[in-house]
């Protein structure tokens, strides 16, 4: 869901922070549940919440959860990211990382619920394991 700068409220900020905490909890749970299966296949699993910048309504702020799978040599063989929140300036529809005169600040929050994000991540983890079995 897209938000204009005028819609950047304390309620939205709290919603983003709540989403961050819940996604972090889900990430730890999934890592705990799935890392053993990857170790059995001589692979390494990383699930990480990535936050660029500190303040959610700052230009260039982004929040996402990423899954990375490394083979036994340490090479990345799978990668997947789910964006949660992104705040950016736009000038004539073009995203900018800096604030220019006449540009508009807006943000986009994922439309999915925590449960839907958890299911999406589980599906990817299962897919990556299935792909490893086929090789």
Label each residue range with its predicted role:
Residues 5, 9, 54, 64-67:
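Intrinsically disordered, low-complexity regions
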Residues 112-115, 119, 123-126, 130, ...:
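Well-ordered alpha/beta subsegment
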Residues 57-119:
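Intrinsically disordered, low-complexity regulatory segments enriched in Ser/Thr/Pro
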Residues 1-35, 127-134:
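Charge-rich, low-complexity N-terminal segments
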Residues 40-56:
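Long, charged, glycine-rich C-terminal linkers/tails
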Residues 26-30, 46-50, 61-64:
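Short amphipathic alpha-helical surface micro-motifs
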């Amino acid at each position: 869901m897209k938000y204009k700068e005028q819609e950047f409220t304390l309620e939205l900020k709290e919603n983003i922070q709540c989403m961050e905490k819940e996604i972090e909890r889900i990430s730890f749970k999934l890592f705990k549940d799935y890392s053993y299966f990857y170790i059995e296949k001589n692979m390494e699993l990383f699930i990480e919440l990535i936050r660029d910048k500190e303040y959610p309504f700052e230009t260039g702020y982004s929040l996402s959860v990423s899954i990375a799978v490394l083979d036994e040599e340490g090479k990345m063989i799978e990668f997947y990211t789910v964006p949660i929140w992104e705040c950016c300036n736009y000038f004539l529809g073009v995203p900018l990382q800096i604030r220019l005169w006449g540009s508009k600040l807006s943000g986009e929050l994922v439309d999915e619920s925590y449960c839907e994000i958890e299911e999406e991540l589980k599906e990817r983890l299962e897919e990556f394991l299935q792909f490893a079995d086929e090789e």
